Amino acid sequence: MTQPNPNKQTVELNRTSLYWGLLLIFVLAVLFSNYFFN
């Protein structure tokens, strides 16, 4: 049995964590803008 390329799996993991980080920053930006403008 041949295992999948571990480098490819690492790249996918980094991409997923990057998307989660961008989503978290976006949510925080919305919360802060609501807090400051109200």
From Swiss-Prot:
GO biological process entries: photosynthesis
Membrane protein topology class: Single-pass membrane protein
Primary site of residence: plastid
Subcellular location: Plastid, Chloroplast thylakoid membrane
Transmembrane segments: 17-37
One GO cellular component term noted in the UniProt record for this chain: chloroplast thylakoid membrane
Superkingdom of this protein's organism: Eukaryota
Keywords: Chloroplast, Membrane, Photosynthesis, Photosystem II, Plastid, Reaction center, Thylakoid, Transmembrane, Transmembrane helix
Subunit structure: PSII is composed of 1 copy each of membrane proteins PsbA, PsbB, PsbC, PsbD, PsbE, PsbF, PsbH, PsbI, PsbJ, PsbK, PsbL, PsbM, PsbT, PsbX, PsbY, PsbZ, Psb30/Ycf12, at least 3 peripheral proteins of the oxygen-evolving complex and a large number of cofactors. It forms dimeric complexes.
Role this protein plays: One of the components of the core complex of photosystem II (PSII). PSII is a light-driven water:plastoquinone oxidoreductase that uses light energy to abstract electrons from H(2)O, generating O(2) and a proton gradient subsequently used for ATP formation. It consists of a core antenna complex that captures photons, and an electron transfer chain that converts photonic excitation into a charge separation. This subunit is found at the monomer-monomer interface and is required for correct PSII assembly and/or dimerization.
Family to which this protein belongs: Belongs to the PsbL family.
Protein name (database record): Photosystem II reaction center protein L
Species whose genome carries this gene: Angiopteris evecta
